[in-house]
């Protein structure tokens, strides 16, 4: 099978060459069950990669990143047979835990003890199923795909430099992301993974990008201990104990001055 290589520059993706593929010997990428490789549709049961990543970290293996149903390891020339054997052993242990539907307290003791009230009585398959069903309900894989397709790119009303100047001059306000529809972002918004800017300063919050970040916010509240790293979007706990996403946007007054009207 062949694929294409893409170079990404903010919101511009161009194919380098058709029928060209490249394998990076320093990257070891695994996929976890949950998405049909032929149809691209969600299966009935899945194992979100973040759960496997948490298990590996609790057992001395640190993945570079995990996202939905893929997990990435970075290899170096210093990796030896013992390290690779340890990785394989831990993945096989996790598989056995899933097959046996072991108690979550046994599979992920550190995470379980940190969030015992939330996960009390859970088994590993229950957690996998619940998280998989959540991703399926919000169709997060298609949201992630849409964010990097030209027809779904956010509308740009200022160039990134202008928006950054407004941020430095503090012509901004911090708003709940749930109320950011139509507001001009002044910081680059980036979830890691994938580690690529989804909203560039000067672009308007909305569409797939906003829906994706709101899905992440909901996931953070539903599954404590599995929060992704976010840049340009800030998570703070409100008075009810809910984790709320916030973002800096251009003030309405400054929008009117720069654009002739508030968006």
Where are these regions (language model features)?
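Non-catalytic terminal extensions of PLP-dependent enzymes
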Residues: 1, 8-263
């Amino acid at each position: 099978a062949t694929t294409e290589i893409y170079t990404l520059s903010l919101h511009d993706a161009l194919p380098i060459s058709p029928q060209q593929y490249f394998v990076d010997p320093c990257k070891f990428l695994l996929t976890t069950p949950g998405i049909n490789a032929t149809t691209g549709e969600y299966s009935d049961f899945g194992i979100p990669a973040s759960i496997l990543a948490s298990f590996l970290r609790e057992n001395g293996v640190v993945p570079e990143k995990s996202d939905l149903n893929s997990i990435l390891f970075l290899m170096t020339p210093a990796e030896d047979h013992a390290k690779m054997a340890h990785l394989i052993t831990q993945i096989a242990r996790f598989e056995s835990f899933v097959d046996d539907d072991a108690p979550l307290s046994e599979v992920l003791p550190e995470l379980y003890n940190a969030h015992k009230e939330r996960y009390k009585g859970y088994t590993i398959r229950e957690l996998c199923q619940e998280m998989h069903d959540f991703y399926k309900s919000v169709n997060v894989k298609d949201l992630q795909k849409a964010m990097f397709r030209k027809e779904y790119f956010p509308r740009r009303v200022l160039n990134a430099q202008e928006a950054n100047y407004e941020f430095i001059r503090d012509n901004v306000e911090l708003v709940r992301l749930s109320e950011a529809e139509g507001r001009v972002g002044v910081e680059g918004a980036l979830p890691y993974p994938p580690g690529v800017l989804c909203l560039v300063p000067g672009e308007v919050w909305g569409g797939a990008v906003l829906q994706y970040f709101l899905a992440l916010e909901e996931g953070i509240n539903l599954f404590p201990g599995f929060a992704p790293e976010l840049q340009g979007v800030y998570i703070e706990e409100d008075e009810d104990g809910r984790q709320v996403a916030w973002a800096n946007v251009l003030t309405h007054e400054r929008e009117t001055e720069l654009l002739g009207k508030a968006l």
